[in-house]
Regions:
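Short, contiguous alpha-helical
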Residues: 2-123, 161-199
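Acidic/histidine-rich alpha-helical segments that form the ligand environment
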Residues: 124-156, 173-183
């Protein structure tokens, strides 16, 4: 029977020359970093479509049963609206979805900054094409500033929107909700843009 070589590595112990894959992986990210990364990813997907939108895309109606925006007597745009969601739900145009983004995001920012939240009727859609794209990009810049100022401790505070003062929901939930709502609306706009381009 052969005698084991004392200089040979013990097969029952980890090889000291092999890196520990877990220990040598990426450094852990904080909750604020992860939420910011998710927001930036969502925005990059949205930007793909914003860069390709034509002014005529905004009011295009893919089906007769649509929600869109209409010129009022004073020249501003007014969205279709119902206090109780209709059954069946109308298909929104790109104009309506972009106004909707501006509405919920502006109100979210009002709450974040401690301002008096604007009413739905206070949110004025700038019009199709570049004005609305600039508006949405401006909201993104303002939201980035909010995210940059948040700490993980801030995320644990009770949310004031969209769940008014419910201790079950925190600022972290609000930030995650913005990411999700923006992704949903960006997907809707992207799908409408591609349908019109293909029609």
């Amino acid at each position: 029977m052969s005698t084991p070589d004392p200089s040979a590595p013990d097969p029952t112990t980890p090889n000291p020359g092999t890196p520990d894959l877990i220990a040598s992986g990426p450094s852990p990210v904080s909750r604020t970093q992860l939420l910011r990364w998710q927001f930036d990813l969502t925005w990059s997907l949205f930007e793909y479509h914003l860069e390709r939108l034509e002014p005529s895309d905004f009011l295009w109606e893919p089906v007769p049963h649509c929600w869109t925006l209409h010129r009022s007597a004073d020249g501003t745009w007014e969205p279709d609206w119902a206090e109780t969601e209709p059954d069946s739900v109308p298909v929104p145009t790109i104009a309506w979805i972009s106004w909707h983004i501006g509405w919920w995001w502006s109100v979210t920012l009002d709450h974040t900054h401690g301002r008096q939240p604007r009413k739905r009727t206070d949110i004025i859609w700038p019009g199709g094409g570049a004005p609305t794209v600039r508006w949405l990009r401006g909201l993104r810049t303002e939201w980035q500033t909010v995210l940059d100022g948040l700490t993980d401790t801030d995320l644990d505070a009770t949310a004031s929107f969209p769940w008014p003062d419910d201790p079950a929901y925190t600022v972290a939930h609000t930030v995650a909700w913005v990411n999700t709502e923006l992704l949903k609306n960006a997907t809707e706009i992207g799908q409408l843009r591609m349908l019109r381009a293909a029609s």
